[in-house]
A protein has these predicted regions:
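Divalent-cation
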Residues: 1-136
Length: 136
């Protein structure tokens, strides 16, 4: 697996949001994932240090996991089908491993809140771009 980090969230002239995940080690490879406006908001808020007046869905998920005795451990971008990426949230609960199917945007929003690593399966490298080809 390849560890990633959130580089930025962009919006194009058509109003489409994209989260750009860069490989954490070399910072040369970018995996762009198109997301919705609310999902972009959910990812950017904790990165900017903002706290909503009421819990957003990822905050609720984090609280529920923790109240049920779980500890989020990592997020994995597992695959792609058509234009849709797939992800998993890995949780440790009393020594047992729990894996939840997730949209990547929700998993990433949880990862930035819990400060847990984001990974992608190595075969997804064919869907990445060189960072020098991306205009921020």
């Amino acid at each position: 697996m390849i560890e990633l980090k959130v580089q930025t969230v962009t919006v194009d002239i058509g109003g489409n949001f994209t989260v750009l995940l860069v490989d954490k080690e070399k910072e040369k490879m970018v995996l762009p994932i198109v997301i919705g406006a609310l999902e972009a908001h959910n990812i950017v808020m904790p990165i900017q240090g903002a706290t909503p007046p009421r819990p957003m869905t990822p905050d609720l998920l984090k609280t529920a996991i923790e109240k049920l005795g779980g500890v989020p451990e990592k997020v994995v971008i597992t695959g792609i089908q058509g234009n849709a990426y797939y992800a998993e949230i890995h949780i440790n609960q009393n020594g047992s491993s729990i894996v939840l199917d997730s949209r990547p945007s929700d998993a990433i929003a949880l990862a930035v809140r819990c400060d847990i690593p984001i990974f992608m399966n190595k075969w997804l490298v064919e869907f990445t771009y060189d960072i020098s080809d991306i205009k921020f």
